[in-house]
Protein backbone atom coordinates (compact mmCIF):
# COMPACT_ATOMS: atom_id res chain seq x y z
CA UNK A 1 0.00 0.00 0.00
CA UNK A 2 1.15 3.58 -0.75
CA UNK A 3 -0.29 6.95 0.09
CA UNK A 4 -1.06 9.39 -2.72
CA UNK A 5 0.36 12.72 -1.46
CA UNK A 6 -2.16 15.05 -3.12
CA UNK A 7 -5.27 13.28 -1.80
CA UNK A 8 -3.93 11.51 1.29
CA UNK A 9 -5.64 8.34 0.10
CA UNK A 10 -3.96 4.95 -0.08
CA UNK A 11 -3.67 2.79 -3.16
CA UNK A 12 -2.71 -0.84 -3.66
CA UNK A 13 0.03 -2.17 -5.94
CA UNK A 14 1.23 -5.77 -6.30
CA UNK A 15 4.42 -4.80 -8.08
CA UNK A 16 6.12 -1.41 -8.59
CA UNK A 17 4.49 1.54 -6.84
CA UNK A 18 4.05 3.18 -10.25
CA UNK A 19 1.87 0.22 -11.32
CA UNK A 20 -1.36 0.90 -9.46
CA UNK A 21 -3.72 -2.06 -9.20
CA UNK A 22 -7.17 -1.53 -10.66
CA UNK A 23 -10.33 -2.72 -8.93
CA UNK A 24 -11.93 -4.97 -11.51
CA UNK A 25 -14.97 -5.39 -9.26
CA UNK A 26 -15.90 -1.86 -10.31
CA UNK A 27 -17.80 -1.87 -13.65
CA UNK A 28 -16.47 1.63 -14.39
CA UNK A 29 -12.93 0.25 -14.43
CA UNK A 30 -13.90 -2.35 -17.01
CA UNK A 31 -15.59 0.25 -19.20
CA UNK A 32 -12.53 2.50 -19.02
CA UNK A 33 -10.31 -0.38 -20.15
CA UNK A 34 -12.68 -0.92 -23.07
CA UNK A 35 -12.20 2.74 -24.03
CA UNK A 36 -8.43 2.27 -23.94
CA UNK A 37 -8.81 -0.71 -26.28
CA UNK A 38 -10.97 1.42 -28.60
CA UNK A 39 -8.24 4.08 -28.66
CA UNK A 40 -5.57 1.67 -29.86
CA UNK A 41 -7.79 -0.32 -32.21
CA UNK A 42 -8.74 2.94 -33.94
CA UNK A 43 -5.03 3.47 -34.59
CA UNK A 44 -4.59 0.12 -36.29
CA UNK A 45 -3.23 -2.01 -33.47
CA UNK A 46 -3.95 -5.66 -34.24
CA UNK A 47 -2.81 -7.34 -31.05
CA UNK A 48 -2.41 -6.90 -27.30
CA UNK A 49 -0.03 -8.40 -24.74
CA UNK A 50 -1.55 -8.59 -21.27
CA UNK A 51 1.14 -8.58 -18.59
CA UNK A 52 0.74 -10.92 -15.56
CA UNK A 53 -2.96 -11.00 -16.36
CA UNK A 54 -3.73 -13.65 -13.73
CA UNK A 55 -2.97 -11.04 -11.04
CA UNK A 56 -6.10 -9.00 -11.79
CA UNK A 57 -7.91 -8.06 -8.58
CA UNK A 58 -11.40 -9.44 -9.18
CA UNK A 59 -12.24 -10.70 -5.68
CA UNK A 60 -10.99 -7.99 -3.32
CA UNK A 61 -7.65 -7.62 -1.57
CA UNK A 62 -8.01 -10.55 0.83
CA UNK A 63 -5.58 -11.57 3.60
CA UNK A 64 -1.85 -10.93 3.52
CA UNK A 65 0.25 -13.29 1.43
CA UNK A 66 2.64 -15.58 3.36
CA UNK A 67 6.33 -14.69 3.47
CA UNK A 68 9.08 -17.08 2.34
CA UNK A 69 12.72 -16.06 2.90
CA UNK A 70 11.77 -12.41 3.09
CA UNK A 71 9.68 -12.48 -0.11
CA UNK A 72 5.92 -12.72 -0.37
CA UNK A 73 4.47 -15.87 -1.88
CA UNK A 74 1.59 -14.83 -4.09
CA UNK A 75 -1.32 -16.91 -2.88
CA UNK A 76 -4.39 -14.75 -2.24
CA UNK A 77 -3.85 -12.13 -4.96
CA UNK A 78 -3.48 -14.46 -7.95
CA UNK A 79 -5.91 -16.55 -10.04
CA UNK A 80 -8.78 -15.07 -8.04
CA UNK A 81 -12.39 -16.24 -8.38
CA UNK A 82 -14.08 -14.32 -11.17
CA UNK A 83 -10.93 -13.68 -13.17
CA UNK A 84 -11.84 -15.99 -16.06
CA UNK A 85 -15.28 -14.36 -16.40
CA UNK A 86 -13.62 -10.93 -16.43
CA UNK A 87 -11.16 -12.01 -19.12
CA UNK A 88 -13.93 -13.57 -21.20
CA UNK A 89 -15.68 -10.19 -21.29
CA UNK A 90 -12.41 -8.43 -22.10
CA UNK A 91 -11.42 -10.82 -24.90
CA UNK A 92 -14.94 -10.82 -26.32
CA UNK A 93 -14.93 -7.03 -26.44
CA UNK A 94 -11.55 -6.87 -28.18
CA UNK A 95 -12.66 -9.32 -30.85
CA UNK A 96 -15.91 -7.45 -31.44
CA UNK A 97 -13.78 -4.53 -32.61
CA UNK A 98 -12.10 -6.69 -35.26
CA UNK A 99 -9.49 -9.41 -35.46
CA UNK A 100 -6.77 -9.17 -32.82
CA UNK A 101 -4.06 -11.50 -31.56
CA UNK A 102 -4.18 -11.76 -27.76
CA UNK A 103 -1.08 -12.70 -25.80
CA UNK A 104 -1.03 -13.33 -22.05
CA UNK A 105 1.85 -13.41 -19.63
CA UNK A 106 0.77 -15.67 -16.77
CA UNK A 107 2.58 -15.53 -13.45
CA UNK A 108 2.91 -19.28 -12.96
CA UNK A 109 5.15 -22.19 -13.91
CA UNK A 110 2.31 -24.73 -13.65
CA UNK A 111 1.17 -25.85 -17.09
CA UNK A 112 -2.38 -26.62 -15.96
CA UNK A 113 -2.76 -23.02 -14.77
CA UNK A 114 -1.37 -21.66 -18.04
CA UNK A 115 -3.86 -23.81 -19.94
CA UNK A 116 -6.83 -22.23 -18.10
CA UNK A 117 -6.17 -18.91 -19.79
CA UNK A 118 -5.82 -20.16 -23.37
CA UNK A 119 -8.83 -21.02 -25.53
CA UNK A 120 -10.66 -19.72 -28.61
CA UNK A 121 -12.70 -17.47 -26.29
CA UNK A 122 -9.76 -16.33 -24.13
CA UNK A 123 -6.10 -15.72 -24.98
CA UNK A 124 -4.67 -16.95 -28.26
CA UNK A 125 -1.33 -17.79 -26.64
CA UNK A 126 0.22 -17.64 -23.17
CA UNK A 127 3.89 -17.17 -22.32
CA UNK A 128 5.56 -20.23 -20.82
CA UNK A 129 8.56 -19.19 -18.73
CA UNK A 130 9.47 -22.83 -18.07
CA UNK A 131 10.99 -22.73 -21.54
CA UNK A 132 11.88 -19.07 -21.91
CA UNK A 133 13.68 -18.34 -18.64
CA UNK A 134 16.15 -21.23 -18.46
CA UNK A 135 19.49 -19.99 -17.17
CA UNK A 136 21.88 -22.50 -18.75
CA UNK A 137 22.30 -24.17 -22.13
CA UNK A 138 20.71 -27.56 -21.52
CA UNK A 139 19.23 -29.04 -24.70
CA UNK A 140 17.76 -32.09 -22.97
CA UNK A 141 15.92 -29.91 -20.46
CA UNK A 142 14.74 -27.55 -23.19
CA UNK A 143 13.35 -30.45 -25.20
CA UNK A 144 11.72 -31.93 -22.11
CA UNK A 145 9.94 -28.64 -21.31
CA UNK A 146 8.86 -28.23 -24.94
CA UNK A 147 7.45 -31.75 -25.05
CA UNK A 148 5.55 -31.20 -21.79
CA UNK A 149 4.09 -27.99 -23.19
CA UNK A 150 3.03 -29.65 -26.44
CA UNK A 151 1.16 -32.32 -24.48
CA UNK A 152 -0.48 -29.99 -21.94
CA UNK A 153 -1.64 -27.06 -24.03
CA UNK A 154 -4.52 -27.47 -26.45
CA UNK A 155 -3.63 -24.26 -28.28
CA UNK A 156 -0.38 -23.11 -29.80
CA UNK A 157 2.52 -22.79 -27.33
CA UNK A 158 4.90 -19.82 -27.23
CA UNK A 159 8.62 -20.07 -27.92
CA UNK A 160 10.87 -17.33 -26.54
CA UNK A 161 14.22 -17.17 -24.79
CA UNK A 162 14.71 -13.48 -23.98
CA UNK A 163 12.60 -10.59 -22.73
CA UNK A 164 12.88 -7.25 -20.96
CA UNK A 165 12.63 -9.12 -17.63
CA UNK A 166 15.74 -11.28 -18.01
CA UNK A 167 19.30 -11.31 -19.38
CA UNK A 168 19.58 -11.98 -23.10
CA UNK A 169 19.70 -15.57 -24.27
CA UNK A 170 23.36 -15.58 -25.33
CA UNK A 171 24.44 -13.86 -22.12
CA UNK A 172 22.89 -16.83 -20.30
CA UNK A 173 23.71 -19.66 -22.70
CA UNK A 174 26.97 -18.59 -24.31
CA UNK A 175 30.48 -19.66 -23.34
CA UNK A 176 33.00 -17.74 -25.40
CA UNK A 177 33.67 -19.70 -28.61
CA UNK A 178 30.32 -21.51 -28.30
CA UNK A 179 28.22 -18.31 -28.44
CA UNK A 180 27.43 -18.37 -32.17
CA UNK A 181 26.79 -22.11 -32.36
CA UNK A 182 24.45 -22.01 -29.39
CA UNK A 183 22.59 -18.97 -30.69
CA UNK A 184 22.01 -20.75 -34.00
CA UNK A 185 20.90 -23.94 -32.27
CA UNK A 186 18.37 -22.20 -30.04
CA UNK A 187 16.97 -20.05 -32.86
CA UNK A 188 16.68 -23.11 -35.11
CA UNK A 189 14.73 -24.82 -32.34
CA UNK A 190 12.58 -21.74 -31.82
CA UNK A 191 11.69 -21.45 -35.51
CA UNK A 192 11.00 -25.11 -36.26
CA UNK A 193 9.13 -26.44 -33.22
CA UNK A 194 5.33 -26.15 -33.32
CA UNK A 195 4.37 -22.85 -31.73
CA UNK A 196 4.52 -19.08 -32.03
CA UNK A 197 8.10 -17.73 -31.88
CA UNK A 198 8.82 -14.41 -30.17
CA UNK A 199 12.18 -12.89 -31.15
CA UNK A 200 13.37 -10.24 -28.70
CA UNK A 201 14.90 -7.25 -30.49
CA UNK A 202 18.59 -7.97 -31.05
CA UNK A 203 18.31 -11.75 -30.76
CA UNK A 204 18.44 -12.03 -34.54
CA UNK A 205 21.94 -10.53 -34.30
CA UNK A 206 23.07 -12.68 -31.39
CA UNK A 207 23.19 -9.56 -29.21
CA UNK A 208 24.42 -9.90 -25.62
CA UNK A 209 23.65 -7.73 -22.58
Locate each region found by the language model.
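Active-site and adjacent substrate-binding regions of carbohydrate-active enzymes
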Residues: 1-209
Amino acid sequence: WCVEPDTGQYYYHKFARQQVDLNWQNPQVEQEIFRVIDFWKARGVDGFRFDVINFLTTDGIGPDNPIDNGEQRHEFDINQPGIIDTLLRLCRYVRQQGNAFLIAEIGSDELDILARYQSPELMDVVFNFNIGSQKTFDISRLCSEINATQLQQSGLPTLFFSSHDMPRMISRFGEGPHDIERAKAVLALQLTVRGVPFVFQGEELGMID
